[in-house]
């Protein structure tokens, strides 16, 4: 991960990066604002619209953290400027999905309906056409929260392997 950590991150227009004294990285852009605590061992600086990360030594753990925080920052910057999107198809006979605000109502073949509440940062759309499988499209500026929500939805009814 140390090679990833050495690469600078160019900031797109409309994205501001602030580094506080207690090593909290704040990225603000047109789609939202994200915060990330960074290990004090990892140094950060912004020069001429470019974010740089540095490390004090070449120990294995330090190299890993160097690349980790650089990758997290890159995802934050991409999220507040472009956003992230996941598309899931619900495959099964009689399966239904309906979104109302941030609550999804799913009928996944159980004897009861499942109500799944999403984080407020996630925007969801469902498309259900007659004769086709329902499609869930989720968008957010936070990649971690979006991936976690997608994994939880998938775990409600695992795909049939056959």
What are these regions (language model features)?
Residues 1-162:
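Structural preference for solvent-exposed beta-strand-turn elements
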